Regions:
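Bacterial Sec-dependent N-terminal signal peptides
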Residues: 1-26
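Carbohydrate-interacting regions of secretory-pathway proteins
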Residues: 19-147
Length: 147
């Protein structure tokens, strides 16, 4: 059976998302009245689980009120999804990246055993440290046949 999940947080192997945040998530009374919902309570990972799993596996935590990836694990194990499904939404979030970090947020992904990673089923909002990326991940010198 296919499960549709609308919001996925993705982390690259060497990137940790947030390193510090100012304050836990809150909604004003007006935002609550308009139907806004928080995906993260600022303290726990309640409401989140690993992609294609029923519970949250390792590699994620809450540090200083922010969801943070440890940067450990392989490509197929670094993704978390919300327990709830969302169809019509506006997604707003704050982020910080480590130097040379590469991470992102995927959305409208499909969970199914035939899909080992969410990025084959949904678009990604890429978060990358452009200034630090080149130094950390410098390309190899082109070989003659590539010129």
């Amino acid at each position: 059976m296919k499960k549709f999940v609308s919001v996925v947080a993705a982390a690259a192997l060497v990137a940790g998302m947030a390193t510090s945040c100012q304050k836990h998530n809150t909604l004003t009374k007006a935002e609550q009245a308009e139907g806004w919902q928080l995906l993260f309570d600022g303290e726990t990972l309640n409401g989140w689980r690993s992609f294609n799993e029923t519970e949250l596996k390792g590699g994620w935590g809450v540090v200083d009120g922010c969801i943070q990836a440890s940067g450990e694990g392989g490509d197929a194990s670094g993704y978390i999804v919300t327990d709830k499904k969302y169809a019509n939404f506006e997604l707003v979030w704050d982020w910080k990246l480590t130097h040379g970090g590469n991470s992102g947020m995927l959305y409208h992904v499909v969970e199914h055993p035939k899909f080992k990673v969410p990025y084959v089923t949904g678009p990604e909002y890429q978060l990358i440290d452009n200034a630090g990326w080149e130094k950390v991940n410098a390309p190899s010198k082109l070989e003659e046949w590539q010129k």
